[in-house]
């Protein structure tokens, strides 16, 4: 019996019919607190890693090695005044930051941390994740329009065009995963990557989806960078053109909520990429399977987040027309062609996805 089963059985005896509700709330709170801590120290890791790439130290004054820097940053933002522009639409202006954070948290309901460790093991988990993650663009548009600023509105329009452009390519990449796994359940998608010729010989990582679906893997991850408006796709808040885009008129915690959503979405994209293409909680080699699955999932997420940061520190920002061209003229044709290729592949005698 697993730890979760033991807690569940004990709680049922103690609280009776109220236990399922209490247990759900406890799990949601635990996941939410862990995500907030991860965001705080992801920001520190980003500043440290970029500092090392620039041959400098990064934050190193607050606490030992700068470990308390995230706490200082949070306190600073909490103490700052939220200044609302006089021409802004009050309620829409205040709703937009909250609306951008809620979907970022909601996606975690269906992401499995290891076998049977998921908040809601729904059969349409992949569809749910895609739908919920698409809601964030409405918050960006709302923020840009409610601020009643031309810079904010330009940023919002850029965000709408960019997210729509790359969501289509991401959708086709997910169709490929659905075709090969035969399920929309994220736990079953991870399970579908745990068999095959290489997995049978103990080399699990060569059986994961990243290898047969390599173009889709690359397109999905790069599109994820664009979806989160990260560098080099950050024309939404291009400092040299439109200052901070849709966030230009926000301050204090309202401003912080946009950044919180951005970093949570980075972790979400990394978690989904690890789940769909990198075997989720599966160990890379069979002889390492004794290590808990959540360790491997966290390690994969950390590696993908480091790639996010490496890309930011390395590449210059694309022009707006270059971003649109990449989405419509490169990624979309590549994913459509690969859907056809995999379709024929699955119908041929060389089908490697036979259950």
Curated annotation (Swiss-Prot):
Pfam families: NADHdh. Its main location: membrane. The chain crosses the membrane at residues 25-45, 91-111, 126-146, 170-190, 205-225, 252-272, 290-310, 330-350. Its EC number is 7.1.1.-. InterPro entries: NADH_UbQ_OxRdtase_su1/FPO, NADH_UbQ_OxRdtase_su1_CS. It comes from the Bacteria. GO terms for cellular component: plasma membrane. The keyword DNA repair does not apply. Keywords: Cell inner membrane, Cell membrane, Membrane, NAD, Quinone, Translocase, Transmembrane, Transmembrane helix, Ubiquinone. GO terms for molecular function: NADH dehydrogenase activity; oxidoreductase activity, acting on NAD(P)H, quinone or similar compound as acceptor; quinone binding. Coiled coil: none annotated. GO terms for biological process: aerobic respiration. It is found in: Cell inner membrane. It is a multi-pass membrane protein. It catalyses: a quinone + NADH + 5 H(+)(in) = a quinol + NAD(+) + 4 H(+)(out). NDH-1 shuttles electrons from NADH, via FMN and iron-sulfur (Fe-S) centers, to quinones in the respiratory chain. The immediate electron acceptor for the enzyme in this species is believed to be ubiquinone. Couples the redox reaction to proton translocation (for every two electrons transferred, four hydrogen ions are translocated across the cytoplasmic membrane), and thus conserves the redox energy in a proton gradient. This subunit may bind ubiquinone. PANTHER family: NADH DEHYDROGENASE SUBUNIT 1 (PTHR11432), NADH-UBIQUINONE OXIDOREDUCTASE CHAIN 1 (PTHR11432:SF3). NDH-1 is composed of 14 different subunits. Subunits NuoA, H, J, K, L, M, N constitute the membrane sector of the complex. Belongs to the complex I subunit 1 family. This is NADH-quinone oxidoreductase subunit H. The gene is nuoH.
């Amino acid at each position: 019996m697993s730890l979760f089963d033991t807690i569940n059985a004990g709680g049922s005896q103690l609280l009776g019919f109220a236990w399922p509700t209490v247990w759900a709330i406890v799990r949601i709170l635990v996941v939410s607190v862990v995500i907030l801590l991860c965001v705080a120290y992801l920001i520190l890791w980003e500043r440290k890693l970029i500092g090392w790439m620039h041959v400098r130290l990064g934050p190193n004054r607050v606490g030992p090695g700068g470990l308390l820097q995230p706490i200082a940053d949070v306190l600073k933002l909490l103490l700052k005044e939220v200044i609302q522009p006089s021409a802004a639409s009050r309620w829409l202006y205040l709703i937009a930051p909250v609306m951008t954070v809620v979907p970022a948290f909601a996606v975690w309901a269906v992401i499995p941390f290891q076998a049977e460790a998921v908040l809601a093991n729904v059969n349409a988990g992949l569809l749910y994740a895609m739908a919920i993650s698409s809601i964030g663009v409405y918050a960006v548009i709302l923020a840009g329009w409610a601020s009643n600023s031309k810079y904010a509105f330009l940023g919002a329009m850029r965000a709408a065009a960019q997210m729509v452009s790359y969501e289509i390519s991401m959708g086709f990449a997910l169709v490929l995963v659905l075709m090969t796994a035969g399920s929309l359940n994220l736990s079953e998608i991870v399970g579908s990557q745990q068999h095959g010729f290489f997995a049978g010989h103990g080399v699990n990582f060569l059986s994961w989806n990243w290898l047969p679906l390599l173009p889709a893997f690359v397109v999905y991850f790069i599109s994820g960078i664009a979806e989160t408006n990260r560098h080099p796709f950050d024309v939404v808040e291009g400092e040299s053109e439109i200052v901070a885009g849709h966030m230009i008129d926000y301050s204090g915690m309202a401003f912080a909520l946009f950044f919180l959503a951005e970093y949570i979405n980075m972790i979400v994209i990394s978690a989904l990429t690890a789940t769909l293409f990198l075997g989720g909680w599966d160990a890379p080699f069979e002889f390492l399977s004794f290590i808990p699955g959540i360790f491997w999932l966290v390690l994969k997420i950390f590696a993908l987040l480091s790639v996010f940061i490496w890309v930011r520190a390395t590449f210059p920002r694309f022009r707006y027309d270059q971003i649109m061209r990449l989405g419509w003229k490169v990624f979309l044709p590549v994913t459509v062609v690969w859907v056809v290729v995999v379709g024929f592949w699955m119908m041929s005698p060389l089908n490697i996805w036979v259950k």
